[in-house]
């Protein structure tokens, strides 16, 4: 059957577009993968206006601030842009390009000025995305005030090599529909956990991506 066929899918891999995927759970027979998301936020929000000499006149750098990130793997702590400001809080075994990229967007010091992060003198706590909700709660208790989560569940159609060949794969519930996935915007268990966490830790801000899924799918 379809579920048995999907049980042969890979549990974790990176596709041709450098997106990282990992099987997180199985929900009513549907495989639920996390996928990394990218954005051009630093350019769009004009962070440089807040720097010393910037148009806003604030001279902000992120100094004395701790930020958090959860992502697909270990941050490359040895990167020239990070110095000693990054702490990997878990035992993530393998460096991940996406995690390192997002941390660079957040806190790269500007050794290469084109790579300068939005909070270029901030410190950062990094964790891999498994067990994120519990780790976030503990980090909030430890005083973390802001964290970035540039990932989400695979929904609808996605192109990749889950089944051994690079092709479009359907991750909606085929018993409900084969061309429309109710999980887009669905207020599920994970979203509820994060809402409860945010309510119980009012000084902790969770920043999460909305995904890159719009328009995905094979030609009609």
Question: Where in the sequence are the language-model features?
Answer:
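Alpha-helix capping and helix-coil boundary motifs
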Residues: 1, 8, 97, 132, ...
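N-terminal zymogen propeptides
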Residues: 1-43, 50-52
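Conserved N-terminal glycine/acidic-rich loop preference
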Residues: 186, 215-220
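Short, structured coil/loop segments at alpha-helix boundaries
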Residues: 7, 17-18, 79, 188-191
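Solvent-exposed, charged interface segments at domain starts and junctions
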Residues: 1-4, 138, 145-146, 151, ...
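Catalytic-core regions built around general acid/base machinery
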Residues: 189-200
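Subtilisin-like serine protease catalytic core
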Residues: 30, 36-167, 199-205, 209, ...
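A solvent-exposed, charged loop/short amphipathic helix patch at secondary-structure junctions
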Residues: 156-189
